Amino acid sequence: MAASCLVLLALCLLLPLLLLGGWKRWRRGRTARHVVAVVLGDVGRSPRMQYHALSLAMHGFSVTLLGFCNSKPHDELLQNNRIQIVGLTELQSLAVGPRVFQYGVKVVFQAMYLLWKLMWREPGAYIFLQNPPGLPSIAVCWFVGCLCGSKLVIDWHNYGYSIMGLVHGPNHPLVLLAKWYERFFGRLSHLNLCVTNAMREDLAENWHIRAVTVYDKPASFFKETPLDLQHRLFMKLGGTHSPFRARSEPEDPATERSAFTERDAGSGLVTRLHERPALLVSSTSWTEDEDFSILLAALEKFEQLTLDGHSLPSLVCVITGKGPLREYYSHLIHQKHFQHIQVCTPWLEAEDYPLLLGSADLGVCLHTSSSGLDLPMKVVDMFGCHLPVCAVNFKCLHELVKHEENGLVFEDSEELAAQLQMLFSNFPDPAGKLNQFRKNLRESQQLRWDESWVQTVLPLVMDT
């Protein structure tokens, strides 16, 4: 009797879904140029999914983009009438019971919530899904695809289980379960994209998943910032962050001055200050795969070199981003007592971030990759702005950073400090290594995202 009741209950739950799925299959035939894009994360901090949506819209698809709306996406996305952003509510874990139980309950409720949101959306010919996070979104999107006739496209940025392993250890039961889940449901997708050749090979060899490498490429708005816009940005940021403010007042009170630039009151001409500090930029999601103590130790060594009389500029170090370890590192930064270095950790508006990269003198990347198979998108954006980079070494970094060509690769804080000393010696030196790297980046004529997407992704969605 109990078994019969359970079967009846299951049928009662599944029948409406099957009927709704059948109707959505019929609807999908009438909306073949519609795509649903899903990221179980913050849309504003998921640039690659924003770029997918913009590229799809540019080529005639309408797009429904589902994700958390914690940060403002780029204006191009918000102003595109082919793209609809549907906000998801971030579910909080229960505060009772063992942590594993709390996590399990959260995953189940997230699955039901995402299923409900997807089933009441316009059906898409494709469901584009960012992974990670893939638990429970891969299974839910696959199930919805089965019901509605949509083809699941997984864009592999990394492995979710490897990120969990940084916190719990690689042999934790949750991590092993997540790995099995990711591998099992990942094989059920129709198309797979990934960010490096190393990941493509790993997916093929270990998970029997065939993927197409779609390298991260900078969007068109990542470019060198004109001096006038640099000045406006510095004046704006100076309102809330003291490192951007002028070190001294100009003789003419009508002259606008920042820490780096000034605008002549009469002519309106913007010039760089003769003894301006160097602007060093890093961006981060403040997670376990980025060790900012390396940068702080290198800055301490740089400070000592300056105090010892080496010909080095003052530094303004801007670390932008949001994430769980931000408060921890902010506390470490406040404990430092630099005389020639100022550090600030702003969260920038989407439109200001490319302007900052295009105004900086050097980028630093501390991303090491939990799997060793993904590449830091921040470096891609920096290269789009022709900004040279010092990046910490890991397994497949060579696919992006060419040592001594477009930047430098380091292993530890000692090596980073030596690189900072070499690059900023006699700053600003037109004949220095920093300007040579920038020249190489200008001459490389790298593909932009739209050009790369047309070559790699568009043929897949048009042919299938």
From Swiss-Prot:
Which top-level enzyme class is recorded in the Swiss-Prot or TrEMBL entry? transferase
Q: Which residues lie within the membrane without crossing it?
A: 100-120
Cited Gene3D superfamilies? Glycogen Phosphorylase B (3.40.50.2000)
Q: Gene name on record?
A: ALG1
Q: Can you cite a GO biological process for this protein?
A: dolichol-linked oligosaccharide biosynthetic process
One example of the protein's molecular function in GO is: chitobiosyldiphosphodolichol beta-mannosyltransferase activity
Q: Which family does it belong to?
A: Belongs to the glycosyltransferase group 1 family. Glycosyltransferase 33 subfamily.
Q: Which InterPro entries match?
A: ALG1-like, Glyco_trans_1
Q: Which residues cross the membrane?
A: 3-23
Q: Where is this region: Disordered?
A: 242-261
Highest rank taxon of the organism: Eukaryota
Give the Lumenal compartment stretches of this protein. Answer: 1-2
Predominant location = endoplasmic reticulum
Phosphoserine modification sites are: 242
Q: Which reaction does it catalyse?
A: an N,N'-diacetylchitobiosyl-diphospho-di-trans,poly-cis-dolichol + GDP-alpha-D-mannose = a beta-D-Man-(1->4)-beta-D-GlcNAc-(1->4)-alpha-D-GlcNAc-diphospho-di-trans,poly-cis-dolichol + GDP + H(+)
Protein name as catalogued: Chitobiosyldiphosphodolichol beta-mannosyltransferase
Q: Which UniProt keywords apply?
A: Endoplasmic reticulum, Glycosyltransferase, Membrane, Phosphoprotein, Signal-anchor, Transferase, Transmembrane, Transmembrane helix
Extent of the signal sequence? none
Topology, Cytoplasmic side = 24-99, 121-464
UniProt topology in membrane: Single-pass membrane protein
